[in-house]
Amino acid sequence: MTRLDEYDYNYVLILSGDQLYQMDLAAFMQQHLEKESELTIATIPVVAEDATGFGIMKVNQENEIEKFTEKPSADVLSDWTSDVPERYAAEKKHFLASMGIYLFKKETLKQLFALNPSEVDFGKGIIPFAINKFYKVHSYAYEGYWEDIGTIRSFFEANLELAMPLPRFNLYDAHNPVFTRSRMLSPSKLLGTSCTHVLIGDGCIINAQEITQSVIGIRSRIGKGSVVRRVVMMGMDMYENYDDVLSQKIIPMGI
């Protein structure tokens, strides 16, 4: 909070760094303001198999969170089912899970930290404390695409899905465009390569025999005759800084 005190603001939005989703944060904020919440948690329904890995909650008809437990064991899950929209119920997603996305009033967050000076975990400490002490804590029901990519497997599969014809997270959706930072790289060059369901970044030179269901990162080089299937290639996306160049005692690029 010491760093946050250096700025003038009224609300604190905390986002998780290991998730893939597209959310209208303006709508998230709007609900927070309308309900005069002190804390709003973005939530999504999940199946029982996944519920043990998330913070699970129970809410009332006003979406106010009445109970919260972090990563419940399988033997108590029956006590944590919620009423969910029909399409989620049909998929057996009966458990309301925290997405790790929080919107706090500034003073609420400062107060919770002051009352819990040694607490460093929102799910295990801060949120249960806020609910038990009757702070106004609400759930924001998110219904779009969301994927936890906190494991190597989930990160890998989410990337491969991007190369499919109609992925759930669509990079080419005109209504939800995705922008990256601009780069001054040449177009990628393919030399006689057969490609099926592939995303290829800028600046690549590819002379493979075949690439199938793969994501090829920027400035990649793939040699003649290679067969690439179900691969996420991060690419040469690291640029050396000046200190790195000096430590190698080489002539800087461009001279």
What are these language model-derived features?
Residues 1-161, 252-253:
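Unchanged
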